[in-house]
Amino acid sequence: MNVFISVVLFLGSARAASKTGDDEWVHLPNKCEVCKFVSIEMKSAFDETGKTKEVIDTNYRFLDDKGAPPIKYVKSDIRFIEVTENVCSRIMQYNLHKERDGSNRFAKGMSETFSTLHNLVNKGVKVVMDIPYELWNETSAEVADLKKQCDVMVEQYEDVIEDWYKGSQEEDLTTYLCEKHVLKGQDTGCLKETWAGKKGDMAAIAEDKKKKKGKKKKGKDGEDGQKKEKKVKKKKKKSKISDSESSKRRMEAAGFTSDEEEIQKKVPLNQPKTEL
């Protein structure tokens, strides 16, 4: 017999809260938080696109003078444009974690609150909310606003980001963009906020699983490489043996032998003396 427990949770939706002006539920991101995640995602995008050794033909380097020699993709204007145009779409991968404070409320992965609610539903518990179940995984008002502000900030500070990109890039992008330009003379406290995670945090658990999976894959690749190396060595050894055997057969067919015992049989050492 299935027992259904009714869990009534009065969580106002972001849309309803914004209409009523209820600041208790909706905390839109401030300038510091926007710059923090813009710089984080931009650094991540540059890291991902900086591993290639691809060379670009000068015909596609339309921002530079014509006739210049081919350039590396990692130094190209194309890479810069691709990163700046797509960086804000990466913000949509974030979710709102209401159980966290400050800028830490924005993070990838499902929030602890909604992970708990999904688990209850999967166990047959009836969860009653004023947000329909179909909208549980919809983008929150806060994340949507984060993306909107990201678009404006990237466009406004494109020249600053380009100066960093075309420079030595020795200085951290968050420091260069946020502390020295976007938030110059303003509060930069959110830039130092970090989330260590806590026991049972589903987002932290998911991140740990990804890291472990990556390590296992690395180890497996190493083992596969060792196995392949052993197989190659065995094949080489077999080929050497087969080569020596085939050469021996060819010599025997021609009437020659390299076997010491056969030589002793064919040419005995103790032959009878002959007189001249």
From Swiss-Prot:
Q: Which family does it belong to?
A: Belongs to the canopy family.
Q: Does the keyword Glycosyltransferase apply?
A: no
Function summary: Toll-like receptor (TLR)-specific co-chaperone for HSP90B1. Required for proper TLR folding and hence controls TLR exit from the endoplasmic reticulum. Consequently, required for immune responses.
GO cellular component term of the entry, any: endoplasmic reticulum
User: Listed disulfide bonds for this chain?
Assistant: 32-190, 35-178, 88-150
Q: Which residues form the signal peptide?
A: 1-16
* Stretch list, region Disordered: 206-276
Q: What is this protein called?
A: Protein canopy homolog 3
Asked whether the UniProt record includes Oxidoreductase among its keywords, one would answer no
Saposin B-type domain location: 30-269
The alphabetical list of record keywords is: Chaperone, Coiled coil, Disulfide bond, Endoplasmic reticulum, Immunity, Innate immunity, Signal
Membrane spanning segments where?
none
Q: Spell out the subcellular localization from the entry.
A: Endoplasmic reticulum
The UniProt GO MF terms for this protein read: signaling receptor binding
Tell me which Gene Ontology terms the entry assigns under biological process: innate immune response
